Amino acid sequence: MDHSKYLLTIFLENDDSFFKYLSEQDDETAMSDIETIVTYLNFLLSLLIRSKDKLESIGYYYEPLSEECKTLVDFSNMKNFRILFNKIPINILNKQITVNKGYLSDFVTTLMRLKKELFLESPEPITYIDPRKDPTFLNILSILHEK
């Protein structure tokens, strides 16, 4: 298994394997590995956005990928709520790195092949600040638009 496939497989697994792996690496290697993950996630995001644009071109509004989409959280199960918003550092000393060699591994292999075949150009990273939601920029814009 090559390194990128290994990284993606442990990253997408629903456990702490990726954190355990990163904790055992030096800073430079960890940052390089994170950059590899970001590259593949950007590819997936680009693929999703292009698909959303195709749907919108025929008049279908795909809300989950839209800019103004609001996420609802189900508060009926407080255990899931705690897991979702738990920002306490993870104790990974006694954890082991597990590599899923089933469907997740197949998905990662397919994703890597698709990325090589499609070669979607990733746009430059852009930070979008919505002045309607940022009071500082809203004030600056109101000053600039005064007559």
From Swiss-Prot:
Pfam families assigned: Pox_J1
Origin superkingdom: Viruses
Keywords: Host cytoplasm, Late protein, Virion
Subcellular location: Virion; Host cytoplasm
One CC-aspect GO term: host cell cytoplasm
Induction: Expressed in the late phase of the viral replicative cycle.
Subunit structure as annotated in this protein's UniProt entry: Homodimer. Part of a complex composed of A30, G7, F10 kinase, A15, D2, D3, and J1. Interacts with A45.
Functional summary from the UniProt entry: Late protein which is a part of a large complex required for early virion morphogenesis. This complex participates in the formation of virosomes and the incorporation of virosomal contents into nascent immature virions. J1 protein is required for DNA packaging during immature virions (IV) formation.
Protein family: Belongs to the chordopoxvirinae J1 family.
Identification of the protein by name: Protein J1 homolog
Organism: Sheeppox virus (strain KS-1)
